[in-house]
Curated annotation (Swiss-Prot):
Gene3D superfamilies: 6.20.120.10. Octamer. It comes from the Bacteria. It comes from Bacillus subtilis (strain 168). Transmembrane segments: none annotated. InterPro entries: Phage_SP-beta_YonK (IPR018600), YonK_sf (IPR037261). The gene is yonK. This is SPbeta prophage-derived uncharacterized protein YonK.
Length: 63
């Protein structure tokens, strides 16, 4: 198998499709990323796309 070079970007936060932004909330600050600009780096390239949603599981006995 030939070697390969991987160009990968990971962004985690709340996605707003109307404005194509992802907002990441950390303990220190809030960061907003231009998702359309990020995707433009891959324009015309052969890509693999994965979208994942994460939710915390409810804890038994806690409301």
């Amino acid at each position: 198998m030939a070697s390969k070079k991987v160009h990968q970007i990971n962004v985690k936060g709340f996605f707003d499709m109307d404005v194509m932004e992802v907002t990441e909330q950390t303990k220190e600050a809030e960061y907003t990323y231009d998702f359309k600009e990020i995707l433009s780096e891959f324009n015309g390239k052969n890509v693999s796309i994965t979208v994942k949603e994460e939710n915390e599981l409810p804890v038994k006995g806690v409301e």
